[in-house]
Regions:
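Conserved AAA+/SF3 P-loop NTPase catalytic/coupling segment centered on the Walker-B
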Residues: 1-10, 31-33
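Charged, glycine-rich active-site and insertion segments that engage polyanionic ligands
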Residues: 18-21, 26-132, 136-178
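Short, surface-exposed loop and linker segments with low hydrophobicity and enrichment for Pro/Ser/Thr
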Residues: 1, 10-14, 120, 127
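Conserved catalytic/switch belt of AAA+ P-loop NTPases
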Residues: 7-23
Length: 178
């Protein structure tokens, strides 16, 4: 958001003209400016994962894939779109392999990053890989090793969002883990 737009928005929030209610809807509250977040009341709406899992199973996905996709997706439309997308499931398979190797501290993890970087050739796919890894880590938080990987993964995501190349951010993650 441009600074002038943010300032105008803050003025509207702080000095409403009349009985006005303003709603901001976002899939990631961290992307909202801190000054705006500090002047709002935040409500979290939970996804209806169980219903989405049932829908995805009815579409023909096995339970494991349906569960992963329900946790990954931010909407029913996104889940339905990705359910039949072969490229998405390739990213899932390769991300699972990377995480398995990271947990086992295998040096081959470094080679897997190159494979993922080739598959994730645009920002959208790169974001998908990072989100897939976050979901996979979230499924096994009881392991201390997985929690450490998740922390480093979040750091790698911040680097990527700060315009470090995807491959460099992922290589950083691997170097921290092996």
């Amino acid at each position: 958001m441009h600074p002038n737009a943010a300032n105008s928005l803050l003025k509207v929030i702080e000095e409403p003209q009349s009985e006005v209610y303003i709603f901001f809807l976002t899939s990631d509250e961290e992307k909202m400016l801190p000054t705006i977040r500090s002047r709002t009341q935040i409500f979290h709406f939970k996804k209806q994962e169980e219903k989405l899992i049932l829908l995805l199973e009815q579409m023909g996905l096995v339970k494991k894939k349906a569960t992963l996709l329900a946790k990954f997706s931010q909407s029913r439309a996104e889940a339905e779109k990705l359910a039949n997308q072969a490229s998405f499931w390739t990213l899932v398979d390769e991300s699972e392999r990377l995480l398995t190797w990271l947990v086992a501290k295998k040096k081959e993890s470094y080679l897997q990053v190159a494979k993922l970087a080739n598959l994730a050739d645009d920002k959208e796919k790169q974001d998908q890989v990072l989100r897939i890894l976050e979901v996979l880590c979230g499924q096994d938080l009881l392991q201390v090793r997985v929690r450490v990987i998740l922390q480093d993964l979040l750091e790698a995501r911040k680097m990527w969002q700060a315009n470090v190349s995807f491959q460099n951010a992922m290589e950083y993650l691997v170097l921290k883990e092996i």
